[in-house]
Structures are given as C-alpha cells and as structure tokens.
Amino acid sequence: MEDTKESNVKTFCSKNILAILGFSSIIAVIALLAVGLTQNKALPENVKYGIVLDAGSSHTSLYIYKWPAEKENDTGVVHQVEECRVKGPGISKFVQKVNEIGIYLTDCMERAREVIPRSQHQETPVYLGATAGMRLLRMESEELADRVLDVVERSLSNYPFDFQGARIITGQEEGAYGWITINYLLGKFSQKTRWFSIVPYETNNQETFGALDLGGASTQVTFVPQNQTIESPDNALQFRLYGKDYNVYTHSFLCYGKDQALWQKLAKDIQVASNEILRDPCFHPGYKKVVNVSDLYKTPCTKRFEMTLPFQQFEIQGIGNYQQCHQSILELFNTSYCPYSQCAFNGIFLPPLQGDFGAFSAFYFVMKFLNLTSEKVSQEKVTEMMKKFCAQPWEEIKTSYAGVKEKYLSEYCFSGTYILSLLLQGYHFTADSWEHIHFIGKIQGSDAGWTLGYMLNLTNMIPAEQPLSTPLSHSTYVFLMVLFSLVLFTVAIIGLLIFHKPSYFWKDMV
C-alpha cells in the first residue's frame, strides 16, 4: 500500500514538473531563436550624404560626406568620400563675368551626381560657404558680392539636390568650424566608458586640439584657453557639445592669408624702391617678374600702402635671402599697440597658447612641399632649411621641381618664411611649443578644414547633450544571452536528475 502511494506521488510530481520544465524550455528555445534571427538579420545600408562647397579666395572645392543614418549623432561617424577641385579661380574673380559661374561649377556638381546614388539626390543637402575672398569683395561692394552669390544660388538650384543656400561665412565662423572639424575627426568630443567601471576615462588628457588655418586671404587661430579669461568679447564663443561646455577663443586675421600678405609686402616695399626695380629677398636669386601697379592696388588689403608711383609697372628681381625676407614680413605685423594683457598683432587679444594645435590648409600644403611636416623637425631645423631653400638659384629650383607650375613654385620661399614669421612672431609659438604643432592634411581620410564642421552644425549632427545609447554592447549582449541559455540548460538537467533520485527521496516528500 505504501509502495503504491509512493509511486503515485512520484508519477504525479514527475508529470507536473516535467510539463513545466518542458514548456519553459520550448518557450526559451523559441525566444532565443527569434532574438538570434532578428539580431542577425541582414539590413540594407541606410546612409546619408551631404555636400559642402568651399568657395575660397583662390579656388573652390566640393566635398561629399557620408554617414550611417542611424548613427548620425555619434562622434566621428561622418567621413569624406570625395573631393573635387573646381577648375579656375575663386568665385570673387567672376564679378565681371557672372554668366560663367554655372559652367565653372558644372564638372564638380556632375561628379557629385555620379558619386551619390540617384535615390539619395533629393534628400542630400548642399551648402556653399564663401570665405575671405568674398569678404574682401563685400568690403569693396556689397552689391557686387550679392550679385555673385545670386548667380551661384541659381546655378546650384538647378541640380536635383536639396540646395540649402550660399552665404559668406564670417572669419569667426571659419575658425570655429575648423576647430570643430579636427576635434570631431580626432574623437576629442567623445567619452568612452570601461565595461567594469562606472568612472569614465578620456582617450587623451588634453580634451581638444587648437586649430590653425591659413588660406589665401585670411588666417584663423582657434583654441580653448586654460584658466584664462577671454578679454575681448568678439573673440569668445561658447559651445555645448555632447554634454560638455567649451569656451573657445577664435580670431580671423583678414588680409593675412598667404596671397594677400604677399600683396601687402609688395605694396609696402615698392614705396621705398628707387625705381621700377624691386630687389626682393623673398624670391629666389635670378627670378624676375613684372607686376602691374594697378593689380597691386586692386585688393582692399593694400589700401593702407597705396600711393601714386611714377611708373605703371615694376619688376621683381629675387635675391633669395631668408633673414631679410623675414624682417620685411615682420613689418606687416603691428606689435606696438596692445590694449589687453597680451596680443598677437594689430592690437588683437591672444591668450597664452595651450596644448597641441592642428595646422591645416596652406599651413600643411606649403610645409608638405618643403618636406617639413614631420613632427621630429625642430623649429631651428625648419629655419635652417628655409634659409637654404630661399638661397637656391631660380634656375636650379625650376629644374628640381619641373612638375610644379612656376606661379606656385616661385612663391614657396615667401610662403614658408611667412608661415614661420606668423607662427613665431605673430602667434608667439616658441621653439618648445613648436613641437606641439601638427601639420595636418587629412584625418581618417577627411580633409582638415572648416567644411565638415560647417555641415555638422547646419545639419544639427552635433547635439548639445550626449546621445542616449544602449546599455550593453553587442558582444556583451551575446555573452549574456549565451550565459542565460546555459543557466536554463543547467536547470533543466538538474530537474531531470531530481526524478532519478532514490526512492527514499520520494518517501520524504510524502
């Protein structure tokens, strides 16, 4: 009788527990399969594109950017897929031939059509930002500047993209967007967290790089000063990016891009020339070039040196002397007046330099040509190499660099000397802080410059607050799924083992 009772209890318990375990196991298996299939289902590529045209003083470049749509608020996900340099000068040179602007832009806009899938054309934003060349034109005539921009807008509106307008950006904007670009690409705005720690850590002790930009008509310096009040409100910008506040110093020196600085130097030096011959230390020995006086005074940058000369043309004759060239350039910087605790030049406030700087655009292109972009090259070594380069005869230079256009080749002595003068005497870098200047062309395949920062700002892809993210990474998620599956499997095994316990186990339950 007792054996029968024990058998009935065992049978009853076995059936019920097995039913529960079996049902739970089936549900768990179905759930795991469903999650696994859903998680690993191949998804179509969901990307977005953006186009920015950099209408500079000497030329226009078109940049195409691409990013995954679902990650557009993450740091560093936007990358450059194409750069197209428009053939010809900057748009400010089309004042007297605005009807040619459409043809001027055609090749690069057609290239954009080819690169971006047709299905994406209508939702791809196009922005054109004009910089110092157009700022100078607007100083001469706002009407002429508006006419050029109107024709540019009409031309770009004819393409199947989402044209967002053309405008002249301020020097302050140009500096700020360049700063945003290099720090975005370097990942300086992101903050990583260790899996086993609730304390965040930075990839680098210095949170941001400073930005040094040199164009044809202006130069910008932008950085976050450490423990220093920005004494001039016009040079102060506040950003809140990814949940962190940045107090940024920026200034754009109009007329101090390398091309306009050369025009300034020539206009200054010709004032003291005894005749129509200008012996110039910033050009190689043996170099000669005739310059029209009318061309010299075309730009607003030379107005302060304008005077009536007894000749219509003058000839530059190079003598190739770095030290004399350097001294001539320094005369462009007024350091006698400073209404603040310290200044760069021309009475412009400049806080103490802090940390690393990325130097791009013409800073990079000139130094790369001179083979001086290596971080191991000291400032003293750069100066010595510039002395030797400038002293080389023009005929020898032409032979050594036969593939370079003479217009550009002839100006590298001046440009290299100007960069040294600007960085050392203009911005007050020293031999020690020179080592913190990084001459940058591209970062992870994207050009260093203001265009990416401009697009990121206008498309609101840099949020003020850190975007929300899933609490677990994909690998952690998979690990936990496997772990819980093993736990479920172990419980099932234990349950089965229970039913194989000796008979006295079941007696105790009765």
Curated annotation (Swiss-Prot):
Arranged from A to Z, the UniProt key words for this protein are:
ATP-binding, Calcium, Disease variant, Disulfide bond, Glycoprotein, Hereditary spastic paraplegia, Hydrolase, Lipoprotein, Magnesium, Membrane, Neurodegeneration, Nucleotide-binding, Palmitate, Transmembrane, Transmembrane helix
Lipid link (S-palmitoyl cysteine) located at?
C13
Query: Which cysteine pairs are covalently linked by disulfides here?
Result: C84-C108, C255-C301, C282-C325, C338-C343, C390-C413
Its predominant location is membrane
Enzyme nomenclature, EC number = 3.6.1.5
Instruction: Quote a single Gene Ontology cellular component term.
Output: membrane
Q: Which residues lie on this side of the membrane: Cytoplasmic?
A: 1-16, 500-510
Catalytic activity entry: a ribonucleoside 5'-triphosphate + 2 H2O = a ribonucleoside 5'-phosphate + 2 phosphate + 2 H(+); a ribonucleoside 5'-triphosphate + H2O = a ribonucleoside 5'-diphosphate + phosphate + H(+); a ribonucleoside 5'-diphosphate + H2O = a ribonucleoside 5'-phosphate + phosphate + H(+); ATP + 2 H2O = AMP + 2 phosphate + 2 H(+)
Q: In which tissues is it expressed?
A: Expressed primarily on activated lymphoid cells. Also expressed in endothelial tissues. Highly expressed in placenta, lung, skeletal muscle, kidney.
Cofactor(s) it depends on:
Ca(2+); Mg(2+)
- UniProt activity-regulation remark: The ADP and ATP diphosphohydrolase activities are decreased by half by sodium azide. The ADP diphosphohydrolase activity is inhibited by EDTA. The ATP and ADP diphosphohydrolase activities are inhibited by sodium fluoride. The ADP diphosphohydrolase activity is inhibited to a less extend by adenosine 5'-[alpha,beta-methylene]triphosphate and of about 80% by AMP-PNP.
Tell whether Calcium is among the UniProt keywords. Answer: yes
Q: Which InterPro entries match?
A: GDA1_CD39_NTPase
One Pfam family in the UniProt entry: GDA1_CD39
Keyword Endoplasmic reticulum tagged: no
Q: What the entry says about post-translational processing? A: N-glycosylated. The N-terminus is blocked.
Q: Which disease is it linked to?
A: Spastic paraplegia 64, autosomal recessive: A form of spastic paraplegia, a neurodegenerative disorder characterized by a slow, gradual, progressive weakness and spasticity of the lower limbs. Rate of progression and the severity of symptoms are quite variable. Initial symptoms may include difficulty with balance, weakness and stiffness in the legs, muscle spasms, and dragging the toes when walking. In some forms of the disorder, bladder symptoms (such as incontinence) may appear, or the weakness and stiffness may spread to other parts of the body.
Please report which protein family the annotation says this sequence is part of. Answer: Belongs to the GDA1/CD39 NTPase family.
| Complex formation | Homodimer; disulfide-linked.
Task: Please identify the protein, giving its name as recorded.
Answer: Ectonucleoside triphosphate diphosphohydrolase 1
Q: Which organism is it from?
A: Homo sapiens (Human)
